[in-house]
Amino acid sequence: MSNTIIGYQNRIDAATFAAYGSWSTTLPLTNIKTRQLSKKARSTNAANSSTKLRFSLDSERIIGSVAIVNHNMQKDATWRYRVYSDSGYSTLVYDSGTINVWPLMPFGSYEWEDSRFWDLQLSAEEIALFTKTLTYVPDTVASAQYYQIEFFDSTNTDGYVELGRIFVGAIYQPEINMSLGASIGDETNTIVDVALSGAEFFDRRNSSRVAQFTLDHLAYNESIINGDIMKISGVDAEVLYIYDNNTALDLHRRAFLGRLRALSPISQPYNTRYQTTYEIKELL
């Protein structure tokens, strides 16, 4: 298990999109810069030449965490993330290579009679349980201004690729992992009404994932970083939560875009160690 990851200070709102790929004029790429995940950008078709984008940030930034949120990519889709040092996109400084959008499950995950026994792919029903979110942590980071993301989903039955939000931000990973007792669960948003007879009626709504954990053994410099994360993020700004980046099979379950539900103080329970707690609620 890798140490938990918090992405913060999303830089996408200051980005400028270049003319690249083919995107709808009624659902343009600028929709990605809104916080409403349902307000999407949509490609004009599903051709690989259309489903790609370029953007420049307001200045050179060190980007350590990336997410594509509320997309519609299907089980055979792949994608690629690249970083450049020049506006002509000719000097490459980072290349993720081609990555599967959805994981392949280990052989034996499904019963012989299951249609997924051989292809080992998640079903559409499994995928629909969660907000469709791609998360990516580059293995090396560079200070750069120019970014390119490509999606390869030409057989998408919708006939296009659409995206609700992009997260490109800073990253924090504690030197010592969160303490035992960390949790991640679902908090219902369903409304329950009770009739005079006692019968219950439900307005079912998507639940929000909530992560709670404590960092008990922070060095002094980490205590400063965590204080800065609280200050920068408040309870309104987006954070990207990744429970364990090494478990690629479950990233769609245990990584999400959220916000801090409360701001916790930095305490000093030991002579040279500091402590803080996090509660992160998923944004829908």
Segments predicted by a language model, with ranges:
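Extracellular/virion structural assembly segments
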Residues: 1-51, 56-78, 82-284
